[in-house]
Curated annotation (Swiss-Prot):
It comes from the Bacteria. This is Ribonuclease 3. One of its GO terms (biological process) is mRNA processing. It is an enzyme of class 3 (hydrolase). SMART domains: DSRM, RIBOc. It comes from Haemophilus influenzae (strain ATCC 51907 / DSM 11121 / KW20 / Rd). Residues 4-126 form the RNase III domain.
Length: 227
């Protein structure tokens, strides 16, 4: 049994075209044939699958409640938890710089890899099979999630924290866009004023402006120890 056989057992899916899995595991720092296009595809499929599951699971919840629960289930820390369960860091291909910087442990890289695997599965065996695999991954998380105030994305939590401290709201600015139109990487700069009235700047990347802004907000919440 080779190392990718072991990974397939962990994720509960057997690829017909193993090259798709290899590409999904390849970070842009390692090769030109990397996983960002697959990540783009997987992000959309994941959001749809979780949205549909929540729609049927919570027939009395409104759009806002469903959106907040979905945001919790598809956000970077949740995907990174799944990645660690699969031990994806042991299978990823990273460039030497990312390896030295511990990229195989970085939440953003792990989360992106999960989405890329989803994209790869959809190309390998189609949407129906892929959505069932995702539901298997999320079985416990879906069983545990409940509508409520704790289901808020990073940007919302950061905004509410700053408002509670009577501090200015964060500002988000796209400072760079790389790649072709169908496969872009957005770099976002977020500025906040801390409780000590000190200006702080955080930079994050994502495959969409929304994901980059959420990643920056998550970074701030961790750095400033905001629960």
């Amino acid at each position: 049994m080779n190392h990718l056989d072991r990974l397939e057992r962990k994720i509960g899916y057997r690829f017909n075209d193993i090259a798709l899995l290899k590409q999904a595991l390849t970070h842009r720092s390692a090769a030109t044939q990397h996983n960002e296009r697959l990540e783009f595809l997987g992000d959309s499929i994941l959001n749809f699958t979780i949205a549909e599951a929540l729609y049927h699971q919570f027939p009395r919840c409104n759009e806002g409640e469903l959106s907040r629960m979905r945001a919790t289930l598809v956000r970077e820390p949740t995907l990174a938890i799944l990645a660690r369960q699969f031990e994806l860091g042991d299978y990823m291909s990273l460039g030497s710089g990312e390896l030295k910087n511990g990229g195989f442990r970085r939440e953003s890289i792990l989360a992106d890899c999960v989405e890329a695997i989803i994209g790869a599965m959809s190309l390998d065996q189609g949407l129906a099979v892929t959505t069932q695999v995702i539901r298997n991954w999320y079985q416990q998380l879906l069983a545990e999630i409940k509508p409520g105030d704790n289901q808020k994305d990073a940007k919302t939590r950061l905004q509410e924290y700053l408002q509670g401290k009577h501090l200015p709201l964060p500002t988000y600015e796209v400072v760079n866009i790389q790649g072709e139109a169908h496969c872009q990487i957005f770099t976002v700069k977020c500025k906040v004023k801390s409780a000590e009235k000190i200006d702080r700047t955080f930079v994050a990347k994502g495959s969409s402006r929304r994901k980059a802004e959420q990643a920056a907000a998550e970074q701030i919440l961790k750095e400033l120890d905001i629960k």
